[in-house]
Amino acid sequence: MIRCQGLRWGAPGQPLTPAVDFELAAGSLTAVIGANGTGKSSLLKVIAGLQKPLAGKVTLDVPRRGSLSFLPQQQHLDRQFPISLQELVAAGFWGIKQTPQQRSERLRAVLEDWHLGGLEQRPLMALSGGELQRALLARLSLASAPILLLDEPHAALDEEGQALLWKHIHAWHAEGRTLVVVCHDLAAVRQHIPNALLIKNSGCTLAPSTQLIQQQPNTQVA
């Protein structure tokens, strides 16, 4: 469960919304939608504990440490950093106790699962946008966090990559994890995500995604 009470976020002295209250049930799958500049990505950072709210609080039903995984937008990653794809993905083992053999087997399985086999030693700068995004998603897959925050996870993915992404999102949801997904593709939200949180400068609305999208036919999201 993610409960936000009296929450305001944004730059100091410049809140993006008035104080809002909403609760995302444990095991729910929710899209965050809204126009450019309404603070969708910032909201995920506040929930993740990476950005302080201007007011209010976020309460989780599990300890934050080790219980939450956050997928940021890939433009925040330094692609000049001298590591390989395999090393990037293996960073997802942080805090997980496994034997070297267990790690090796799990890493190999995850790389194959995200169609990254054969790219293990490729440096970040040599990866395509889609390959890098799948690597970041593979890193996320190594953890078993009950709460997953995904900021535009479909970015840079081709049609095959997006199908793979939604397959995993549905699998994580079926496992009972709580997922919050920033997504600008309303057609994908309507098809794959049952609930949506619409953010406007006037506040937030939480409702079934089909209902919200139908009521907001001209909503531009990104």
Placement of each model-derived feature along the sequence:
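Helix N-cap at the start of a conserved alpha-helix in ABC-type nucleotide-binding domains
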Residues: 159-161
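Catalytic Walker B motif of ABC-type/P-loop ATPase nucleotide-binding domains
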Residues: 148-152
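Helix-to-loop junction immediately C-terminal to a conserved catalytic motif
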Residues: 48
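Conserved ABC ATPase "signature" region
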Residues: 102-119
